Amino acid sequence: MSEQSSVVVIGAGLAGTEAAWQVAKAGVPVTLWEMRPFKRSPAHHSSEFAELVCSNSFGALSSDRAAGLLQEELRRLGSLVIQTADHHSVPAGGALAVDRGRYSAALTSALDDHPLVTIRREEQLTLPDPDQIAVLATGPLTSEALADDLRAFTGREDCHFFDAASPIVEGESIDMTKAFRASRYDKGDADYINCPMDQDQFLAFRAALLDAEQAELKDFDQNSATFFEGCLPIEELARRGEDTMRYGPLKPIGLWDPRWGDVNDRDVRRAKRAYAVVQLRQEDKDGRLWNLVGFQTNLKWGEQKRVLRLIPGLEQADFVRFGVMHRNTFLEAPELLEPTLQFRRRPHLLAAGQITGTEGYAAAVAGGWLAGTNAARLVHGHDPMQLPHTTMIGALTHFISEAPSGKFQPMPPNFGLMPQLQECIREKRARYGAYRDRALADLQRTIDESQVDNVVCTA
């Protein structure tokens, strides 16, 4: 081991939780700092680790999808956070979604019970000493004091965009005489509740969205607010055009209520098909709570209740959580980070999670895995590792460290980040399958060569 025989991890979100676990699993003592519950961000509701503040979904499960491939790579690397998500999953069609409460509680208990993990429930006001091996995993809602110190260290103003979370309603309050259970194109079980609209209902709903009063966002210019395109507020989609929502979260294609008649009868299909459909996804194991898919919003809470109750089936909906919007901060990673997630100016300091400019839950976990693994390797006196560019994790970390600087924006996992295949495959699913096969083969080779400890450990 090096003279520095312990690691500090700041932030117990998805990335910090994974990082701390990987450090401890490598036999290295780790101190995990988390400011909650004594100081909360605008988006958090609990003091549990790895709280999911937006959706409860990690994205598609299928490994020929970008998010699904990222999840599968993490499973094979022994990710605690992903394996725990598998254990606490709820029905969500072809996606990996979890019971938020049980999921976060399980991860909190796993770290609390680990003999090498020390938890400090207080705010970290400054970056650790330069000689301290540390992982910065404070997320997009980094506290003001630490953000100020980070700006002083990097010599740069942080970048930011605005993100939002969807409302959640009680399942018993949904009128199932108007709504119906189904998954799109009948894939898998009928895991979603669907609220169909005709054209008049949709236009009235859109008009109400456009007229609704928004909550005031602090510390930013309303006219220059930047949103992440993958998580736009529903009212922003409404502003972009009459059909924008219908080609986004409210698209009706592939959803049919058997009460309408025979879907294979063309005349029935033309007469009965919905103009738009609002989908709700299960939040908990018992199916008592449901979130409105794609309904991130910054409307005032009273306005949310008024407008969302215009949706057929939700006229008497009981809201257990309203949508909120918050500022997301991220680093100018191409200027600051190596593909190992070390800061170029301070190799003992690593960054992980959404603060690095990756987008999505699974990407945050991936950053936590790599930063935690490399922090432990530094303690043991080993060189930090990179994952192959042909893996989804490697493609993401290479992108954020090598992208053109100046206009850097958060990036979700996608196959466009990966090196092209040697052979030309025109059919998309087959092409994505080939990307997957190459990625998993190269990942296994790296696991074998680097002696990665990928023992399955679930909370």
Curated annotation (Swiss-Prot):
First-tier enzyme category under EC: transferase
Gene Ontology BP terms: tRNA methylation; tRNA wobble uridine modification
EC number: 2.1.1.74
Ligand binding (FAD): 11-16
Main location: cytoplasm
GO cellular component labels: cytosol
SUPFAM superfamilies membership: FAD/NAD(P)-binding domain
Cofactor(s) of this protein: FAD
Gene3D superfamilies assigned: FAD/NAD(P)-binding domain (3.50.50.60)
Reaction equations catalysed: uridine(54) in tRNA + (6R)-5,10-methylene-5,6,7,8-tetrahydrofolate + NADH + H(+) = 5-methyluridine(54) in tRNA + (6S)-5,6,7,8-tetrahydrofolate + NAD(+); uridine(54) in tRNA + (6R)-5,10-methylene-5,6,7,8-tetrahydrofolate + NADPH + H(+) = 5-methyluridine(54) in tRNA + (6S)-5,6,7,8-tetrahydrofolate + NADP(+)
UniProt superkingdom: Bacteria
Keyword terms, alphabetized: Cytoplasm, FAD, Flavoprotein, Methyltransferase, NAD, NADP, Transferase, tRNA processing
Localisation: Cytoplasm
Its biological purpose: Catalyzes the folate-dependent formation of 5-methyl-uridine at position 54 (M-5-U54) in all tRNAs.
NCBIfam families reported for this sequence: gid_trmFO, PRK05335.1
Protein name: Methylenetetrahydrofolate--tRNA-(uracil-5-)-methyltransferase TrmFO
The gene coding this protein: trmFO
